[in-house]
């Protein structure tokens, strides 16, 4: 019975090995529907699928048909986060190498599919707490793991089993606890010369800055988890600013022991750079960290 259920699930997935597509990363993001692209293809499909009774021109019966559409730009799109130029800057020279890429937080797997076709010789790993049935795709080089990033035991087992990665992309919780927990848990798994990417931190930072400003202007205390933003923290790492150690003494945030002095020592000793990048999209934000 279980084998029959699994067979039914996998038979409905889009087989990435059976699709021949362009190798341009932004086009792949648009085609598969990742919001990392300049245009958000998933939102177009979702929008017109809801309206298809009144829209005879939208002839795509399912997402596989949508992925295989011709004339990619002949549709109405919402603007995406425009991450492709940033990724291309760092990934272009290694796109044809055999590497290991891990994305943390994959939802239906549209970014995984894009990276699978872009890095056409590489192993692509994905982690998410959603059941594997929610993943739209399959491929011989694609590996998916149903893991909650806050489950320390499962994360330890995963990193022990799968060793180092050349690229790690955090696209999961987008808040302080999630971002810092992932950084601590996965930085050691980043290989020498590898890239650790943190996406979509800007909204959390702006929200926090406004809240701190409001309390200060009204002579009140800000009692959040910490008094720094994600952008501030990783800028301090890049500047090798040892004042970052003082952040560990802040309470109650660091009572959870997310960060430790020994971990920061490790980062300072192995970090080549940590740089933020933004596009003109209001929430587009990315930190690119390179390990020596």
Which residue ranges define each predicted feature?
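A short alpha-helical cap/connector motif
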Residues: 1-169, 173-198, 202-292
């Amino acid at each position: 019975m279980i084998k029959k259920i699994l067979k039914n699930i996998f038979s409905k997935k889009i087989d990435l090995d059976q699709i021949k597509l362009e190798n341009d990363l932004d086009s792949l993001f648009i085609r598969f529907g990742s919001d990392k692209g300049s245009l958000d293809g998933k939102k177009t499909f979702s929008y017109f699928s809801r309206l298809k009774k009144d829209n005879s021109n939208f002839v795509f019966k399912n997402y596989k048909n949508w992925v295989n559409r011709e004339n990619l730009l002949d549709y109405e799109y919402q603007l995406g986060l425009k991450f492709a130029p940033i990724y291309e800057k760092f990934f272009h020279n290694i796109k044809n190498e055999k590497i290991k890429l891990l994305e943390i937080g994959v939802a239906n797997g549209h970014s995984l599919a894009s990276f699978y076709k872009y890095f056409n010789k590489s192993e692509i790993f994905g982690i998410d707490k959603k059941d594997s049935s929610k993943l739209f795709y399959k491929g011989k080089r694609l590996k998916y793991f149903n893991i909650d990033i806050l489950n320390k035991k499962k994360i330890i087992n995963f990193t022990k089993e799968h060793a180092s990665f050349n690229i790690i992309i955090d696209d999961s919780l987008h808040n302080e606890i999630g971002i810092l927990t992932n950084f601590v848990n996965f930085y050691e798994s980043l290989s020498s010369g590898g890239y650790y990417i943190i996406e979509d931190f800007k909204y959390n930072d702006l929200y926090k800055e406004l809240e701190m400003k409001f309390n200060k202007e009204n002579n009140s205390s800000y009692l959040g988890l910490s008094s720094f933003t994600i952008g501030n923290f990783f800028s301090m790492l890049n500047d090798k600013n040892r004042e970052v150690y003082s952040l560990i003494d802040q309470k109650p945030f660091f009572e959870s022991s997310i960060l430790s002095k020994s971990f920061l020592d490790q980062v300072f000793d192995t970090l080549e750079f940590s740089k933020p990048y933004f596009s003109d999209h209001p929430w587009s934000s990315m930190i690119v960290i390179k390990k020596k």
